[in-house]
């Protein structure tokens, strides 16, 4: 699974979130093992799969990693992919994209290319 999206207000755009809700959903991506009543735990059906996520941020790295405790990463890794059984996750982040030089943007794109070629 490859996701490429900006992070807006510490979330992916609604169209990406909607895709996640529709595609990575039970019973295809995971199912629940019932313990008792309405209580249970997820069992992922995508255990041998890999996820690669490319995200751009308008914020600097310090704000996202320090003040907001990597919230977008934790939401995606734990709340989506781990539930589906995907633990092989490559997460590439590019910070302060609107404010960097064109040379830095070219380095970002080169990193995307290198990551994609190593699939």
Model-predicted segments: where are they?
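Helix-loop-strand module that forms the ligand-binding subsite of alpha/beta enzymes
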Residues: 1-77
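Glycine-rich phosphate/pyrophosphate-binding loop and the adjoining helix
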Residues: 63-119
């Amino acid at each position: 699974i490859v996701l490429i999206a900006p992070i807006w207000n510490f979330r992916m755009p609604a169209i990406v979130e909607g895709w996640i809700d529709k595609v990575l959903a039970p019973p295809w991506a995971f199912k629940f093992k019932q313990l008792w009543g309405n209580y249970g735990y997820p069992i992922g059906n995508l255990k041998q799969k890999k996820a690669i996520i490319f995200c751009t941020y308008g914020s600097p790295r310090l704000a996202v990693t320090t003040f907001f405790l990597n919230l977008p990463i934790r939401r995606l890794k734990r709340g989506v992919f781990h539930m589906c059984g995907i633990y092989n996750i490559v997460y590439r982040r590019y910070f302060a994209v609107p404010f960097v030089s064109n040379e830095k943007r070219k380095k970002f794109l080169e990193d995307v290319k290198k990551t994609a070629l190593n699939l």
